[in-house]
Amino acid sequence: MLINFFVLPIIGVLLFLGHLGGFVGLLSVRAAGILFVPCHWILVFYEKVCRLSVSLPGAVWITGQPDWQKLLLFYLILGAVLFATKKMKQRRGFVFIGCFMLLAVLHNPVKGFELDVLDVGQGDGMYLHTKEGTNFFFDGGSTDVSKVGTYRMLPFLKAKGVKKIDYWIVSHTDADHISGLKEILQAEYEIDHIVFSKYVLNDEAYQELLALAQTYGTEILKMDCGDTLTDGEAGLRCIFPDKTYKSDDKNALSLVLRYEDQEFSGIFTGDISSAEEQYLVEHKKAGSVTFYKAAHHGS
């Protein structure tokens, strides 16, 4: 409705000049080009209005992917609403109640603990939802899947009904760990924080990601060894690297985190090598876990 307030008053001008320019173009391309100039700027104005409307609070609803039972219930309620609008006198109240019920049916957020490892090809991408309702995402990129963020990661998040990521963990800045994250930032999906290691290499990829985060209002956090992101009874603790470990290798300085709650524990390793794994064992930083993400894609 709001968009129509801006679109409808000048759509007649757009159609008139567009058709006129088409006919004039049969005689003179130059003259038609002059007529198409205002058409171009009207369309640019429409695009700006649409982009602005999408950015308004509540403009985009992420409902999640419902199961077949909810879809069946959705169509039954929809049919009842349509039938009632024809038969009942108090239509408005019934329609309002029906619409509210439809929204309730279509709202499908993730509930309870969940860990998903996404198929992103040559790369990494994992989603973790805690019992408290906090959303974590670990890395997110690929070198052999085109637009992995647009066509795999973002559809996954929307299908799960995830409206935002609270903490997006970046183990390091290789393309197969951040290419999808960059696409999701550019899609203006809400990410509250991006988390790096305190010892992340300050390279071009890191600076590019910082610039994107600043553009889209995402806060940057850095974790040192021993730092913990707490979430009720759960915690995500940095166990590597620490200030004593020196390397110029981006993979070797991957941020390694240990997640633990009362029923589950897991280690997320990035692309560390066997040398860093041995370091974790020798310094007793790993411990036994329920889940271990094979380092460097299992290499």
Predicted feature residues:
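Non-globular, low-confidence helical/coil segments that flank catalytic cores
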Residues: N4, L15, G22-S299
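Active-site pocket-lining/capping segments in soluble small-molecule metabolic enzymes
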Residues: L8
